């Protein structure tokens, strides 16, 4: 990309919108779907002050694919003064065929004609959203022969992507941005190989990454994992944004800019919904909620590979991990578990970072440059 570019956009992810009549009553749930709509309204009010060119929403717009919730979101986004682009998350098309609760998978594009899906015949798309800026919205939800949902891109979509990127490259100097729900780079230690994190990654991420690198695509925006994290590998950033209904209730605002030396940068600022009616101290309340309801998750982390601790030993460590996952979700975490057995200490401290780039950063987008995570600029300029 040699052309100077300067534009501004926002990212909201994993909204899990649920109208009151569709809310599931589940006392074990750690995600607060009850605040989904008011939190979205607060975020949209804040974003309206940012003078953005467009908004990206990388999936999980609804609680569980309810037609009423899809219709509500489409109507709400239609009233916004800037373009919005969406893609489906696993919660948006949880079933192949419609049932009493959820829409059929192939119905999703029809709800979002105004938000990327002018062609409703397939669940992925591309648009030149600004001069010399192309967005590709991908679908990471497929179904196996038994009708089970799988986080994977099928071959027809991969072939379409190759053709789309080839045409973009032939047409001239375009900046390409990609949006997909499942993570394509690891945001947690060994996420691609260990069970509890593996399901949040695209099964055939390596194949997708090979295609993106072949066409010099640098930016991928994901969701699904409900954490704030920026991962980088061999020229590609996977910027995943946390969920609006769980701690820390984040959204992001970006400024893509070109400096006087024709170097390209992506400036990122993260913001949080701090309060909604009935939840005046929202972040602290949901932090405690996750602490109260997170024991079973922590026990799984401790008793499964790679630690494989006994249940008795795991229960001894759980109280010290009460706020572990909220710290991971907030991003830029630094951990010190010096009182833990060595293997457990090393494992849990590996979820932290030595460089704070998950929330506020200036990320280099220069051609052909290789920046390791620890060398990235952590202060916006």
Show where each model-derived region lies:
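Acidic/histidine-rich helix-loop elements
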Residues: 13-38, 94-117, 144-153, 192-197, ...
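N-terminal active-site segment of His-dependent metallophosphoesterases
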Residues: 1-70
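Active-site environment of divalent metal-dependent phosphoester hydrolases
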Residues: 18-21, 63-66, 90-98, 143-146, ...
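Active-site-proximal beta-strand elements of phosphoester/diester hydrolases
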Residues: 6-22, 132-142, 177-179, 237-242, ...
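Extended active-site neighborhood of metal-dependent phosphoesterases/phosphodiesterases
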Residues: 67, 71-166, 253
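Beta-strand-turn-beta hairpins that frame and shape the catalytic cleft
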Residues: 2-10, 122, 126-140, 172, ...
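His/acidic metal-ligating clusters that form di-metal
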Residues: 45-54, 134, 148-237, 324, ...
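Non-catalytic terminal accessory segments
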Residues: 1-4, 278-381
């Amino acid at each position: 990309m040699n052309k100077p570019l300067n534009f501004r956009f926002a990212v909201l992810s994993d909204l899990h919108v649920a109208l009151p009549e569709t809310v599931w009553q589940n006392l074990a749930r750690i995600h607060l779907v009850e605040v989904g709509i008011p939190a979205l309204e607060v975020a949209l009010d804040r974003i309206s002050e940012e003078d953005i060119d467009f908004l990206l929403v990388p999936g999980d717009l609804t609680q569980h694919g309810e037609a009423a919730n899809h219709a509500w979101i489409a109507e709400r986004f239609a009233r916004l003064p800037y373009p919005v682009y969406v893609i489906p998350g696993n919660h948006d098309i949880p079933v192949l065929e419609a049932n009493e609760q959820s829409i059929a998978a192939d119905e999703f594009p029809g709800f979002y004609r105004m938000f990327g899906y002018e062609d409703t015949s397939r669940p992925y798309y591309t648009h030149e959203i600004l001069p010399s800026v192309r967005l590709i919205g991908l679908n990471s939800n497929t179904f196996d022969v038994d009708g089970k949902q799988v986080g994977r891109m099928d071959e027809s979509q991969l072939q379409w992507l190759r053709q789309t990127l080839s045409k973009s490259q032939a047409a001239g100097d375009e900046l390409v941005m990609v949006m997909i729900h499942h993570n394509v780079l690891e945001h947690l230690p060994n996420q691609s190989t260990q069970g509890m994190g593996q399901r949040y990654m695209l099964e055939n991420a390596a194949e997708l990454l090979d295609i993106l690198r072949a066409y010099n695509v640098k930016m991928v925006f994901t969701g699904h994992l409900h954490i704030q994290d920026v991962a980088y590998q061999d020229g590609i950033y996977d910027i995943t944004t946390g969920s609006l209904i769980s701690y820390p209730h984040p959204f992001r605002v970006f400024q893509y800019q070109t400096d006087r030396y024709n170097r390209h940068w992506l400036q990122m600022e993260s913001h949080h919904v701090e309060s909604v009616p009935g939840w005046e101290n929202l972040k602290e309340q949901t932090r405690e909620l996750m602490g109260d309801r997170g024991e079973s998750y922590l026990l799984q982390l401790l008793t499964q590979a790679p630690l494989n601790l006994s249940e008795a030993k795991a229960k001894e460590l759980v109280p010290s991990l009460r706020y572990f996952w909220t710290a991971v979700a907030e991003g830029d975490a630094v951990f010190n578990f010096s009182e833990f057995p060595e293997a457990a200490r090393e494992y849990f401290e590996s979820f932290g970072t030595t460089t704070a780039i998950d929330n506020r950063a200036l990320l280099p987008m220069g051609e052909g440059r290789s920046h390791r995570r620890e060398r990235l600029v952590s202060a916006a300029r």
